[in-house]
Amino acid sequence: LNAGLQYTGSKTPRRSTQGFELTFAVNHLSHFYLIQNLLPSINKSNNSKIIITSSEVHNPMSSGGRVGAKASLGDLLGLVYGAGFEMIDGNQFNADKAYKDSKLCNILFAKELSKRLRKKNLSIPVIAWAPGLVISRDSQGFFRYSRKYNLLGQILFAFFARDLLRIATSNEKAGMLLSDLVCSSKYNKYDFSYYSNKIISPGKFIFEKSTISKEAESEHLSNKLWELSKSLIENQIR
């Protein structure tokens, strides 16, 4: 599962057909809904894995997570209010934070899903991973939706990050990491795990098992996110 919708620079939230803030709807809630429908088939197949693409920006202590607004879901008050919320924590819309929050949701969802599968004695690895900063050379990919808000800024950022500082990776290399996660037996641990593609020097990365943020470790938060996501779907989608 992979969705990285972001509208950096936008001052107002966009909404799904059901009225959900679009970053949350696409990056988290669609994953939750899809997995509920796929689980019966996944349970019947051999050597299944569930892989969810997150980001290091879910962690306020990471290099990307420290820049701008910090990821934090509070007590999920926005979700308690129903479909009309602007931010998960109940505050006013911030496009940068909305993206980071959605990536934190990815981690919490993966962790809670793994716990619930184990309680059912289902041996299915659940992996969350962060590919790192991926910037393509075409008009797609990174910031493709937010270019209209700051085209020059996005072009300059891509040049410095990808070509000058070399802290970004390519679509092809990120795809190879995902392929390895899917195909390699070394990622068959029947538990939740998180892997990150971390930069160690310009142009050089190491893909390794990593720690999640302190907030992502919260069992209370992961369970509450699950139950509220389920409620939103039952009330607004089905």
Model-derived regions: residue spans:
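C-terminal helical subdomain
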Residues: 102, 157-209, 219-220
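Short acidic, glycine/proline-rich loop/turn micro-motifs
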Residues: 13, 206-213
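A catalytic-pocket lid/entrance helix-loop region that shapes and gates access to the active site
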Residues: 146-149, 214, 225-226
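Charged catalytic carboxylate motif
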Residues: 105-108, 173, 224
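C-terminal functional modules
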Residues: 228-229, 233
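Alpha-helical interaction elements in eukaryotic regulators
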Residues: 16, 221-225
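Alpha-helical membrane-targeting segments
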Residues: 91, 133, 137-171, 205
